[in-house]
Amino acid sequence: MPFLKSLRLDGILSFPPGSEPIPLTGLNVLIGPNGSGKSNLIEGIELLHALPTGFASAIREGGGAREWLWKGENTARVGTIETCVEYLSLFKVVGRSSTETLGLIHHPPIFRYRLAFSALGQRVEITDEVIEDETKNGDLDPDSSSYYRFKKGNPIVHARSVNGLTNTDRREKRVLDPTALKQDESILAQLKDSFVYPELTGIGQKFEQMRGFREWSFGRNGQLRQPQPADLPSEALLPDMRNLGLILNQLEHSSAWAEFNTYLSRFLPRFQRFSTLIVGGTVQFFLHEAGMKMPIPATRLSDGTIRFMAILAQLLSPTPPPLICMEEPELGLHPDAIALLASLL
């Protein structure tokens, strides 16, 4: 089941006011001419990714709030991003069922998340934010079907009640102090407690775990070719891929390693094996080819080989992100290599 079920951008970038939601499946391929809005859709996904950590920073780095708003006829004053997310994918706990662990047994299968923002001078201001049951749209009492609602600056959250040291499945309606909340940051960045606010926390964690790869830099002096610090994250490939060595080292010690080598042998006829080396607090990776006495370091591998390995490592990860977004992954690859990756996608 895909984590994101749909995405709607309204009054944002090239998406005019009144834009319809875009349904999403397990695999989504965007094809269109230059300027058709493919990159803008990816920008919207990156906004979701930034919500739990730094929405204001993401808006600022994109040129400021006014640059994000629709600039066509009848210029938009408010931009809205809305998505529906699959409930069960939020709460996966090893060894126990998600509903048993969190005490959540009466949820519908889909949540709806919506955030609206406008420009306040040079700053961004959040004007609306809602987390609710997807099936409860239009309820006579919208508060009863929501887990958080901005309510025109009078925010309300439904928190799980606590009986002693035990969490229950009952909800308590809490009115938050608006002066204690930052007006340019999402509630996902300000309320984080998996037991008291499981829906907010679960959605925020999944948004943060999403990965987007847009700037492919495989030049001779690229960071991913150099010895990489061993203390970088090893759970998922970073957007700039500077932890590729650590990801490959993790993959080497997983059940997916044999499949990784199988794909590399189909990609490189001379491929013999792949290895990583940890020394001096850094990680390096090497390619061994038949007929060669010494392995080939990352600094000498071709751009296409590095690109194929990076994509392969991400697609074979034992703990994949809830969403992987790749912009033009086919660049620099032989058509035969694209066919190999297509089967994994």
PLM region spans:
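Broad gene-expression machinery/nucleic-acid interaction feature
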Residues: 4, 80-84, 110-112, 125-127, ...
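Conserved P-loop NTP-binding catalytic core
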Residues: 43-123
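Short, solvent-exposed polar/charged micro-motifs at secondary-structure junctions
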Residues: 94, 222-224, 283-287
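Electropositive, glycine-dotted interaction segments
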Residues: 98-262
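Extended helical coiled-coil dimerization/tether regions that scaffold
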Residues: 232-298
